[in-house]
Amino acid sequence: MKTIIALSYIFCLVLGQDFPGNDNSTATLCLGHHAVPNGTLVKTITNDQIEVTNATELVQSSSTGKICNNPHRILDGIDCTLIDALLGDPHCDGFQNETWDLFVERSKAFSNCYPYDVPDYASLRSLVASSGTLEFISEGFTWTGVTQNGGSNACKRGPDSGFFSRLNWLYKSGSTYPVLNVTMPNNDNFDKLYIWGVHHPSTDQEQTSLYVQASGRVTVSTKRSQQTIIPNIGSRPWVRGLSSRISIYWTIVKPGDILVINSNGNLIAPRGYFKMRTGKSSIMRSDAPIGTCISECITPNGSIPNDKPFQNVNKITYGACPKYVKQNTLKLATGMRNVPEKQTRGLFGAIAGFIENGWEGMIDGWYGFRHQNSEGTGQAADLKSTQAAIDQINGKLNRVIEKTNEKFHQIEKEFSEVEGRIQDLEKYVEDTKIDLWSYNAELLVALENQHTIDLTDSEMNKLFEKTRRQLRENAEDMGNGCFKIYHKCDNACIGSIRNGTYDHDVYRDEALNNRFQIKGVELKSGYKDWILWISFAISCFLLCVVLLGFIMWACQKGNIRCNICI
């Protein structure tokens, strides 16, 4: 019984132990940083996955689904290709003299006139698209001895046979087709684009019935170039009831140069010229609808915001667009390293500093203080260190965007079948560029993330060192981001430490005196729980021993009888 009384006395002493923060003559001050229950994983140079409190996605992975009509002027081709609009296909007459920043060709576009081919289709399409206009000026060509304005039932304009409005089909007059030799100087100060063609009859009979001569020839020259085309007579696959074809060619006449056209048959003559302009207009194949909205960047999938530095929506873009990369996601850290707060801290609910874990619920700052003193507990943010970190992180996203946003458009690359090797080379170059940019993007983000985490850790350490220098020997570093203050420190005192007005000398004597009065052995908080549980276990064991001894004594005296049956 004496043993039990002694153990109970020890247990009470343990419970009455003077723990840090419970003594009115001391206080505990901890420094910590913001934490969230579920952070975001980012990549750094040294770590493939590190959790931070906040991060911003840098890759735009979706479009609006529509092409915005502002600030770029969008011209919807509807059912016309750009070349059909250029030639003057009857169903494309509405595009005459139109202008655009971006011409949108649709998959449903079709030709509805005389069947033709353009040997250098991609180059002509690109040239006209970049000019951004179909402005056409008629000129007074003189074609003597031939019939003009030929037409075909395959190219009806209303109920009548027609032809391309920008071309003039010449054929024999009576039974003659004289040699034509026409010149047209360029006396203006801009480039002129002339579109002309050569007719390829399907039979020799068709050739002579239209042009008299068994074989025609067309030569178009300038001071810088010359093209001579001999018609290829022969049947071709039937298109819109015709097995003959027209080949479309084009010539650019510079200022001061002269256009010379010579032919003895098969000439599809120009009616004038297109005024060429230099600019950044372009063309794009897309079936996305055109909507009333604002977006600087357009892809075939639709417009996309350009508030992110990277995108993986489409390689083809127009406008000021994010750089295309292969990655679906790249996250830029805009917060500090995240260490979620431990939910339980032993029997006494002790507070802990940044070395052990972060603090959840700090909504007014990234860094702050928690304290325990005679007036209770409290928490406050340190706005100065928070602002110092935010100021350095702010603008990081904008700087990355400035480094990566393209101020030009990436157009479609088209090549004819005979340029297959060039197309393969172009594809290889483009794929290599994308690989390099994807690698550079990942490296850039990893470097920025490393800098952000190091920066926020540095600000935490600066705040801790600033507090240490204020307290000096008036407090002891507890090794977990906390200080044990050896003098009475009420809320006003704690506030002076936070705002940097703490006077070390005022509390020096009291702190030194309290240090010497501390008990010889101060149990660390980690061992208190162990001692309590061990004391409790020993007490229970001794109680069981006493109870068992009492039962055996009672049985021996006959007060209790125990029968064991087998």
UniProtKB/Swiss-Prot annotation:
Top-level lineage group: Viruses
Question: Residues on the Extracellular side?
Answer: 17-530
What keywords are assigned to this protein? Clathrin- and caveolin-independent endocytosis of virus by host, Clathrin-mediated endocytosis of virus by host, Disulfide bond, Fusion of virus membrane with host endosomal membrane, Fusion of virus membrane with host membrane, Glycoprotein, Hemagglutinin, Host cell membrane, Host membrane, Host-virus interaction, Lipoprotein, Membrane, Palmitate, Signal, Transmembrane, Transmembrane helix, Viral attachment to host cell, Viral envelope protein, Viral penetration into host cytoplasm, Virion, Virus endocytosis by host, Virus entry into host cell
GO MF terms here are:
host cell surface receptor binding
Q: Summarize the PTM comment.
A: Palmitoylated.
Report the subcellular localization.
Answer: Virion membrane; Host apical cell membrane
Q: Which GO terms describe its biological process?
A: clathrin-dependent endocytosis of virus by host cell; fusion of virus membrane with host endosome membrane; fusion of virus membrane with host plasma membrane; viral budding from plasma membrane; virion attachment to host cell
Q: What is its main location?
A: virion
Task: Give TM segment ranges.
Answer: 531-551
> How is the protein disposed in the membrane?
Single-pass type I membrane protein
Glycan attachment sites = 24, 38, 54, 97, 181, 301, 499
Residue numbers with lipid attached (S-palmitoyl cysteine): 555, 562, 565
InterPro entries tied to this protein: Capsid_hemagglutn, Hemagglutn_HA1_a/b_dom_sf, Hemagglutn_influenz_A, Hemagglutn_influenz_A/B
Q: Which Gene3D superfamilies match?
A: 3.90.20.10, 3.90.209.20
SUPFAM superfamilies assigned to the protein according to its UniProt record, in alphabetical order: Influenza hemagglutinin (stalk) (SSF58064), Viral protein domain (SSF49818)
Q: So which residues are the signal peptide here?
A: 1-16
Task: Give me the Cytoplasmic side stretches, as residue ranges.
Answer: 552-566
Q: Name one GO cellular component term.
A: membrane
Q: Where is this site: Cleavage?
A: 345-346
Q: Which cysteines are joined by disulfide bonds?
A: 30-482, 68-293, 80-92, 113-155, 297-321, 489-493
Note the subunit structure.
Answer: Homotrimer of disulfide-linked HA1-HA2.
Q: What does this protein do?
A: Binds to sialic acid-containing receptors on the cell surface, bringing about the attachment of the virus particle to the cell. This attachment induces virion internalization of about two third of the virus particles through clathrin-dependent endocytosis and about one third through a clathrin- and caveolin-independent pathway. Plays a major role in the determination of host range restriction and virulence. Class I viral fusion protein.
HAMAP family assigned:
INFV_HEMA (MF_04072)
* Family the UniProt entry places it in: Belongs to the influenza viruses hemagglutinin family.
- Other facts: Major glycoprotein, comprises over 80% of the envelope proteins present in virus particle. The extent of infection into host organism is determined by HA. Influenza viruses bud from the apical surface of polarized epithelial cells (e.g. bronchial epithelial cells) into lumen of lungs and are therefore usually pneumotropic. The reason is that HA is cleaved by tryptase clara which is restricted to lungs. However, HAs of H5 and H7 pantropic avian viruses subtypes can be cleaved by furin and subtilisin-type enzymes, allowing the virus to grow in other organs than lungs.
Its protein name is Hemagglutinin
Q: Which gene encodes it?
A: HA
